[in-house]
């Protein structure tokens, strides 16, 4: 698991806060990138009409069995950067993800481009990525990702997360 840089959310209060922050509606179709051990997936499946959850690490298959059997869940194995997002049915209206540094910016930009029905992105990223995505024009960190993200949605930093809430 270390090879993939997996960090699993372990704090139940934070998991509930993420679901609240996502402001999911009962008719939402959620795309979760990085199912991990499925603890957030279960909560998302309970709050939305449908959940597409993506996990790259097959070693997590035993932990995700309880999520995969839920009637409103489609579990997709593989790299989210290679997944045919436009082919997902039903089409996602929200994304909730704890994104690793290496794919955070490209994946956010890819979902903006390829999933026009997305209404909300609730993504956990490293602080520097969040600051880059919400950077003001003319600032040192402003660039194409900032402009694209800000044209597509309102970018806000919701909370800082203590590293202690993760299991490695």
Give the location of each predicted region.
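Catalytic cores of RNA-modifying enzymes
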Residues: 1-168
């Amino acid at each position: 698991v270390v090879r993939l840089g997996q960090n699993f959310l372990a704090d139940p209060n934070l998991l509930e806060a993420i679901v609240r922050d996502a402001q999911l509606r009962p008719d939402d179709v959620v795309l979760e990138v990085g199912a991990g051990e499925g603890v957030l997936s279960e909560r998302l499946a309970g709050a939305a009409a449908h959940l597409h959850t993506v996990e790259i690490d097959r070693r997590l298959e035993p932990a995700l069995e309880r999520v995969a059997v839920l009637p409103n869940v489609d579990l997709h194995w593989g790299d989210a950067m290679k997944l045919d997002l436009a082919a997902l049915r039903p089409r996602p209206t929200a994304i909730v993800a704890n994104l690793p540094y290496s794919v955070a910016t490209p994946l956010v930009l890819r979902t903006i481009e390829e999933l026009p029905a997305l209404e909300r992105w609730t993504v956990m990223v490293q602080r520097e990525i969040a600051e880059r995505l919400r950077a003001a024009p003319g600032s040192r960190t402003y660039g194409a990702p900032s402009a694209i993200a800000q044209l597509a949605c309102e970018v806000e930093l919701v909370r800082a997360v203590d590293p202690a809430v993760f299991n490695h």
